């Protein structure tokens, strides 16, 4: 029974260690890989069977070939599905597909469990059925309706200053100036 109780690999590793006291739990994240060779040490320990459960961030999905993965669990996938970016569904599908590709590569078939409050979400349905083409057709239709790339071009301007108030005022002034020329095509500022 997976319930959202906190965030981060450290918290998840602690919970798993308590639930499965005999399991050797390892972490694969920035905090556990402080030295350059820690990356390889952790992966080698997992492949040698010195780590039973490896808790990691998105780094694990990125083209790393690890043998003997029988189960991948994605907690709180809703966060991944609802990033405020027009590409979030495409990116979520890609990341979840990469993770799915990590399991059951050489031995027996693996299992992927995804925690979600929206099991009927279009990204999860496409992942389950393998219908990437259908997902992208829907995405392209939505992008056209809402005026997102590739149907328009977006430009993001970051305004930075050591004094947050100065940055806020400057970004509002800039947005006002741009609106005079471009009208409602200007979104923001987001402060």
What do the PLM-derived regions correspond to, one by one?
Residues 188-191:
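Short, intrinsically disordered low-complexity segments
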């Amino acid at each position: 029974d997976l319930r959202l109780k906190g965030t981060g690999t450290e918290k998840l590793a602690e919970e798993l260690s308590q639930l499965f006291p005999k399991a050797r739990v390892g972490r694969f994240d920035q905090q556990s890989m402080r030295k350059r060779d820690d990356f390889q040490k952790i992966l080698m320990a997992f492949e040698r069977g010195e780590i039973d459960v490896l808790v990691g961030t998105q780094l694990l999905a990125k083209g790393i070939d690890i043998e003997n993965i029988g189960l991948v669990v994605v907690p709180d996938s809703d966060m991944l599905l609802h990033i405020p970016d027009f590409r979030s569904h495409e990116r979520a599908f890609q990341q979840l597909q990469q993770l799915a590709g990590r399991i059951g590569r050489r031995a027996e078939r693996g299992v992927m469990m995804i925690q979600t409050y929206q099991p009927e979400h279009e990204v999860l349905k496409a992942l389950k059925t393998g219908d990437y083409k259908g997902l992208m057709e829907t995405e392209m239709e939505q992008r056209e309706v809402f005026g997102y790339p590739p149907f328009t071009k977006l430009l993001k301007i970051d305004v930075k200053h050591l004094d947050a108030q100065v940055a806020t005022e400057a970004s509002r002034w800039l947005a006002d100036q741009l609106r005079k020329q471009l009208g409602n095509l200007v979104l923001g500022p987001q402060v």
